[in-house]
């Protein structure tokens, strides 16, 4: 598959940084899809549908493998989105203090030549330390995680919020499960290590 171009259907700088770890040249495109949850759709169904939709929405003129990814954070059965501002971030972290939350990340690789899409879901659990309001405010003011699901950056100071992490790939928390991606690329004929 040397003639296949790798494309990341995302403008997220976090996902781009993760994909760079694989040392494969890639380009990025902004996906064009409606991210509104469907009525009755589970978190798992939502992230899988959106990952596939993002990958398939990119119009490519050459043979490419297009990567789509989507992530939601679930606490007490409710999907928690990005906070977008300081007040919401503080409220989210206050609700998560001493709790366990689950991240579901949908991942899809679309082959623009064959039309085939391979996809999977990765689950990652985060157990928060009991946090004081002062700790939460200090963290939010220092790291400003306004565009991160769950209101934290696990790759930064956010690690101080956690008691325990459970999952097969810590990259999942940042939004791109690389272990699963390596497998999906291999299923499409692209070997990361050659």
From Swiss-Prot:
Transmembrane segments: none annotated. One of its GO terms (cellular component) is cytoplasm. This is 7-methyl-GTP pyrophosphatase. It comes from the Bacteria. The active site is at residue 70. GO terms for molecular function: nucleoside triphosphate diphosphatase activity. Its cofactor is a divalent metal cation. GO terms for biological process: nucleotide metabolic process. It catalyses: N(7)-methyl-GTP + H2O = N(7)-methyl-GMP + diphosphate + H(+). It is found in: Cytoplasm. Keywords: Cytoplasm, Hydrolase, Nucleotide metabolism. Pfam families: Maf (PF02545).
């Amino acid at each position: 598959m040397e003639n296949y171009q790798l494309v990341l259907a995302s403008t997220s700088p976090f996902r781009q940084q993760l994909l760079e770890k694989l040392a494969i040249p890639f380009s990025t495109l902004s996906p064009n899809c409606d991210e509104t949850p469907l009525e009755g759709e589970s978190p798992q169904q939502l992230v899988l549908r959106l990952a596939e939709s993002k990958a398939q929405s990119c119009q490519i003129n050459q043979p490419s493998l297009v990567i789509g990814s989507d992530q939601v954070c679930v606490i007490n059965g409710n999907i928690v989105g990005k906070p977008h501002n300081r007040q919401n971030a503080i409220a989210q972290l206050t609700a998560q203090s001493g709790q366990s939350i689950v991240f579901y990340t949908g991942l899809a690789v679309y082959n623009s030549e064959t039309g085939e899409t391979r996809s999977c879901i990765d689950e990652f659990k985060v157990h928060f330390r009991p946090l004081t309001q002062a700790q939460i405010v200090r963290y939010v003011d220092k790291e400003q995680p306004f565009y991160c699901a769950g209101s934290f950056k696990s790759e930064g100071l956010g690690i101080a919020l956690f008691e325990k992490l459970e999952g097969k790939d810590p990259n999942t928390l940042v939004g791109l499960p690389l272990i699963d991606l390596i497998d999906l690329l291999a299923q499409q004929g692209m070997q990361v290590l050659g």
